[in-house]
Amino acid sequence: MLAKHKLARINELAKKAKTAGLSAEEAFEQAKLRREYIQAFRKAMTDMLHTVTVIDPSGNDVTPKKLKESQRRRFH
């Protein structure tokens, strides 16, 4: 995930935006940090999904075909 100091800075800029407003440089920094956060979140979510197997109540593997193909591409 994203470094703690970057998350703290995102929160700090968000609070400042609500109270006093942001300068152009701060708005640019906030947008950049948010893009980094979203990118890191998506990567973590994708990595997590590549470890998932869906099993129905009968014990059958019902993992979606698209996910199985993605898992095969990633691990082979």
From Swiss-Prot:
InterPro entries: DUF896 (IPR009242). Residues 63-76 have a biased composition (Basic and acidic residues). It is found in: Cytoplasm. It comes from the Bacteria. This is UPF0291 protein GK1331. Belongs to the UPF0291 family. GO terms for cellular component: cytoplasm. Keywords: Cytoplasm. Coiled coil: none annotated. Residues 57-76 are annotated as: Disordered.
